[in-house]
């Protein structure tokens, strides 16, 4: 009798933990390598253009930004 109760409680606990874990990971990607690949693709150093507030002396500004303040130190990408 005690063993049956322990087994029932264990099954209920494992079922509840599976449901909680499934709900938590619903919007996350399954494979860590895919997430890392996306992070490397969006890495700041991998872009070919300067973002807002970055210098435009050595690289062009990203689309939608303009190089402003082209003094002696070069300009800054701004809207």
From Swiss-Prot:
Propeptide: 23-47
GO cellular component annotations of the record: extracellular region
Signal peptide: 1-22
Disulphide bond pairs: 49-62, 56-67, 61-77
Tissue expression from the record: Expressed by the venom duct.
Annotated compartments: Secreted
Pfam families in the record: Conotoxin
UniProtKB keywords: Disulfide bond, Hydroxylation, Ion channel impairing toxin, Knottin, Secreted, Signal, Toxin
Residues where 4-hydroxyproline is found: 60, 63
Keyword RNA-binding: no
Gene Ontology MF terms in the entry: ion channel inhibitor activity; toxin activity
Primary subcellular site in the record, as a coarse category: secreted
Family: Belongs to the conotoxin O1 superfamily.
Described function: Ion channel inhibitor that inhibits the increase in intracellular calcium upon depolarization in DRG neurons. In vivo, both intraperitoneal and intracranial injections into mice induce hyperactivity.
Record note on domains: The presence of a 'disulfide through disulfide knot' structurally defines this protein as a knottin.
Protein known as: Conotoxin Vi6.1
């Amino acid at each position: 009798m005690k063993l049956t109760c322990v087994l029932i409680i264990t099954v209920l606990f494992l079922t509840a933990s599976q449901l909680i874990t499934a709900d938590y990971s619903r919007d996350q990607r399954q494979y860590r390598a895919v997430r890392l690949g996306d992070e490397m693709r969006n890495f700041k150093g991998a872009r070919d253009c300067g973002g807002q507030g970055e210098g435009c002396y050595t690289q062009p500004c990203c689309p939608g930004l303009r190089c402003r303040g082209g003094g002696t130190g070069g300009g800054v990408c701004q809207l």
